[in-house]
Amino acid sequence: DRYKQSARKDIYQAFAKYLIEQGRAYPCFATPEELDEMRKKQEAAKIRPGYYGVWATYRNLSVEEAAKKIKAGEPYIVRFKSMGNEERKIRHHDVIKGNVEFPENDQDIVIIKADGLPTYHFAHAVDDHLMRVTHVIRADEWLSSVPLHLELFKALGFAVPKYAHTSAILKDDEGKKRKISKRKDPEAAVSYYHEEGIPAEAVKEYLLNIANSNFENWRRQNQAEDMEHFELQLNKMSVSGALFDMVKLLDVSKSVISRFDAEKVYSESLKWAEKYDEELAEMLKADKELSLIHISEPTRQA
């Protein structure tokens, strides 16, 4: 299974070995106590935290010294040896954000943990290269990791993918905008929309409205078309986060349901009712034909 990291341990270790041979990675024997002491000193001196520069005490350990420690059974991890300088800047084009500028990465981050498995950063580079990934779409909280990932890809000799960093969906919380939270907000869970009786198709269409402002106009002109035919364009996505709008979502939901045939409305309603409204489920099952008539030709008030 190419997606199961534990089954790909040998692959990651082979690439880590390559970096070590190239002088771009090294075994680090720093103990938790040493790292904690380092953090305290950095905090006291009010300088950037991390394992870099003079703080990277095992960075220049000789091959003989490292081999001796490994042979003695000392636990270790493997760190990437950065050649960056925090005082230098790099310029990068993000598909969504446009041109962005960062300090170079100078952190000797962990690439192989003590259990032999990779960190996210290393797995991202190795897996995406082997799976021929051309575009990486992820949350903008990862934007600051771009300098590290660019350096890592180049050190491995890999083609760098195009990055597209999406902004989070926001919520109005008593007049203040904040990111929708998995801990605080039920709207962050897919199950919430199912419980509310909102079809998955409606949620997808609403998200397309947020993703590309021209989707709404496309939908008006192509009412019978499957949304899959809409061409989502990353460079037209909003740079800032969109505000979650339940009224708009319900409006989209009504429009989506209106395109369902009566049989689909009935079957989807029954599935929902069997889980969330037993009384309604019994009514629907009692007379399917009558239910279909009501769905197809809703009673009109005079």
What are these regions (language model features)?
Residues 156-292, 296, 300:
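Catalytic adenosine-cofactor/nucleotide-binding cores of aminoacyl-tRNA synthetases and other
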Residues 8, 12, 145, 199:
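Hydrophobic (often cysteine-bearing) scaffold residues that line and stabilize catalytic clefts
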Residues 1-15:
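Aromatic/His-enriched, Gly/Pro-containing loop or helix-boundary segments
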Residues 13, 22-24, 209:
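Residue patterns forming the tRNA-binding/recognition surfaces of aminoacyl-tRNA synthetases
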Residues 5, 18-21, 25-165, 170-180, ...:
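Active-site cores that bind ATP or allylic diphosphates and position pyrophosphate for catalysis
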